[in-house]
Curated annotation (Swiss-Prot):
Belongs to the thymidine kinase family. Its EC number is 2.7.1.21. GO terms for biological process: DNA biosynthetic process; thymidine metabolic process. The lineage of its organism: Bacteria, Pseudomonadati, Pseudomonadota, Betaproteobacteria, Neisseriales. This is Thymidine kinase. Keywords: ATP-binding, Cytoplasm, DNA synthesis, Kinase, Metal-binding, Nucleotide-binding, Transferase, Zinc. It comes from Chromobacterium violaceum (strain ATCC 12472 / DSM 30191 / JCM 1249 / CCUG 213 / NBRC 12614 / NCIMB 9131 / NCTC 9757 / MK). Zn(2+) binds at residues 140, 142, 177, 180. InterPro entries: P-loop_NTPase, Thymidine_kinase. SUPFAM superfamilies: Glucocorticoid receptor-like (DNA-binding domain), P-loop containing nucleoside triphosphate hydrolases. GO terms for cellular component: cytosol. PANTHER family: THYMIDINE KINASE, THYMIDINE KINASE, CYTOSOLIC.
Amino acid sequence: MAKLFFRYAAMNSGKSTQLLQIANNYESMDKKVALYTSAIDDRYGVGMITSRLNIQRESNTFDAGFDFLAHDYGDTACVLVDEAQFMTPEQAQQLHRLAHKRNIPVICFGLRTDFQGHPFPGSAWLLSLADDVEEIKTICHCGRKATMHIRIDGDGRRVKEGPQVEIGGEARYRAVCGRCFHHD
């Protein structure tokens, strides 16, 4: 029986690298995978899943109006979703149905919370619906386990207000532990 998996972490933890490794594992056994990433995240080009190890793959994109159930997955062995925090609650429900009604494993990777510690709606629903939830670990600059992230400006100063979604990588965000998150 297929499952819905959610693998979450702070930024710069290797989520995209793991997703690309899983895709490679399936494809090395001549199995077909369906790759998705958010159309919002265009740091490396629209429809590109890119790891910080400079591994890159083309991908399908989803936006708020995308319906995962409308696609014909045919002989797809696994559905892999990067940047899953940008999904809508309805899309998280669609992926749950896809795993359980069409018997296709779905593995989602994303952030749990934003730079203010607020949950992303897509992630909140994945945490509720996923059959298997796994935290991918990374470390804070102080050496503790990073579970949060902060937004920084061009001078490296913390930004505490602003829109929930602002695309950026290491130049805009840092993974931090809870203690450093609350440090003023």
